[in-house]
Amino acid sequence: LMGARCSKGIIDLLENRGVDILFDMTCTGLKREFHVEPDNLLQAYAWQLLNQVPCLRMVKAVNRENYMEGFRDRLDGILYHTVQFCDNYAYEYTDLKHRLDIPMLMVETDATKQCEGQIRTRVEAFIESLKIAKGASIGKKSLKKAEDGKMYVLGIDSGSTSTNAVILNENKEIVAFDVVRTGAKSGESAERILSEILERAGLKREDISLIVSTGYGRVSIPFADENVTEISCHGRGAHYFNPDVRTILDIGGQDSKAIRLNENGEVVDFVMNDKCAAGTGRFLEMMARTLEMDI
């Protein structure tokens, strides 16, 4: 973790996703635990203060790469945090991004509680890409089978306008699918679509081997076994339908994304903006209604 000071919410987000933070080199990240000499208190205290990671607004940070070398064998990636209008850190990020052979993700916040939700998708997608790079599997585990000996997996995409669900069997064949309006509470629409799609498929809840949620409301679906970012889902889906796809553009509701894939359909890199209504279903509906146009 590097860059400008970040909130506890960001650190909690990382730790809740199983991230081991090797070091916190933000300007307020290192612990202020000073071991001073009682006989030379002032000089010892001053020495400890001057050896803290400095703010880039005050002094140029040096020897950061030497510090990171000690973690090289355990360092999978770097989350670089900046605060809005604190532009000094963007220059250091650009320099490190080009010189270090380490995956890096820069996130910018405005020190408010709301911004933590905005960066959740990109942070989780970054973590997923790092796990895949290490050979870990996203959304794969030993699955139980239904009473008929078959395996069924349910996927739920919770969007701003609609909640979509599909059940696949072990041969990746569609058994049933359904679409309902999301409404005010994504959790309630997810419960409703679960009931409807099971009825369509003629299955019971215990017949489903795995439930995976995605979309902006994925964390609001309590019965999901796993939640995966739409970035990783885009990569898997595009590669399944066309293995030659290397670039995906997603004009979404909360943000827009540009995603780069490798030959295996794995997310190599991605960029996002923070605010975008271009692909929001409700925004499009309101504009169509205002312009008196049919969709």
Show where each model-derived region lies.
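Redox- and metal-dependent alpha/beta enzyme cores, enriched for Fe-S-associated oxidoreductases
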Residues: 2-67
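Short acidic, glycine/serine/threonine-rich loops at helix termini
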Residues: 12, 166-169, 190, 220-225, ...
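C-terminal hydrophobic structural anchor segments
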Residues: 60-101
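Peripheral docking tails and interdomain loops at the edges
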Residues: 91-144
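Conserved phosphate-binding catalytic cores of ATP/NTP-utilizing and phosphoryl-transfer enzymes
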Residues: 141-148, 216-262, 266
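N-terminal glycine/serine-rich phosphate-binding loop of ATP-dependent small-molecule kinases
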Residues: 148-230
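Glycine-rich phosphate-binding loop plus the immediately following alpha-helix
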Residues: 182-186, 268-295
